Amino acid sequence: MSAAMSEVRIAAEPRTEFGKGGARRTRRAGKVPAVLYGHGKPPRHIALPAHDLLHAFKTDAGTNVLLTLELAEGTELALAKDVQRHPIKGSFEHIDLVLVARGEKVVADIPVQVIGEPHPDTLVDQQVTTIAVKADATRLPGPIEVDITGLEPGTSILARQLVLPAGSELDADPDLVVVQCLAKRTNAQQEASLGETPVAEEAGVASASV
C-alpha cells in the first residue's frame, strides 16, 4: 500500500445562477454545481466540467484525488468533501469542495479493501468499507488492504490493527471492528434450517383453519 499521489488540474468557473433551476441548467450545460469553502474564506459557488471531474475521480485516489482548481483569480488546492450523485443515473448532482494547503493535515475516509483467502470454514463479514485517516492533504493513502489469509472463525480485525503508510494516522475508534470472521453453516445445519420451514408453514395453516 502506498500514499495516493494523484493530483488533477481542472478548470472552474463562477456560478451566477442559484437554486434548483440554476443547478439544472448548469448540469444541462455539462457542468457540475459546486461550492468551494474553507480557510476562513467566504463560500464560492463554482461549476466544474462533468467529464473532467469524472476523469479525476477515476484515478487511483478516487474521490480523494487532490484537485488543483484553475480559477479566474488563480489556483486553489481542494478535496471533495461531499459528492452527491443522481440516485438512478449516477451522474454528478453537486459537489462540496474544501480548500487545503500543502503540508496541511486533513481527515479523509479511505476505502478498506479485503485481500486473501480465509480458512475454508470461515465466512468473512466486512463491517466497514471506509475508515477515517488523518494525513497530509497531498499524501492521502490509497485503499487500505486488510489481509484475511488463513483467518479462522472467531477472529476479528480491529481498526488499530490496520497497517497505515508512514505519515498517516487513524482518526477512528481504535476498537472499531473492521472485519469479523464467522463460522460457515454446515450442510447439516442448512438442511435442518430448510426442514424447519415447511413445519412452520404447516403450523400456520393449521392454526388459521381452526
Curated annotation (Swiss-Prot):
Subunit structure: Part of the 50S ribosomal subunit; part of the 5S rRNA/L5/L18/L25 subcomplex. Contacts the 5S rRNA. Binds to the 5S rRNA independently of L5 and L18.
SUPFAM superfamilies: Ribosomal protein L25-like
GO-annotated biological processes: translation
Superkingdom: Bacteria
Alphabetic keyword roster: Ribonucleoprotein, Ribosomal protein, RNA-binding, rRNA-binding
Residues making up the signal peptide according to the UniProt record: none
Annotated function: This is one of the proteins that binds to the 5S RNA in the ribosome where it forms part of the central protuberance.
Entry keyword annotation includes Kinase: no
GO (cellular component) term, any one: cytosolic large ribosomal subunit
Origin organism lineage: Bacteria, Bacillati, Actinomycetota, Actinomycetes, Frankiales
Pfam families assigned to the protein according to its UniProt record, in alphabetical order: Ribosomal_L25p, Ribosomal_TL5_C
GO terms of molecular function: 5S rRNA binding; structural constituent of ribosome
PANTHER family assigned: RIBOSOMAL PROTEIN L25/GLN-TRNA SYNTHETASE, ANTI-CODON-BINDING DOMAIN-CONTAINING PROTEIN, RIBOSOMAL PROTEIN L25_GLN-TRNA SYNTHETASE, ANTI-CODON-BINDING DOMAIN-CONTAINING PROTEIN
Protein name: Large ribosomal subunit protein bL25
Family designation: Belongs to the bacterial ribosomal protein bL25 family. CTC subfamily.
Keyword set includes RNA-binding: yes
NCBIfam families cross-referenced by the UniProt entry: bL25_bact_ctc, PRK05618.2-1
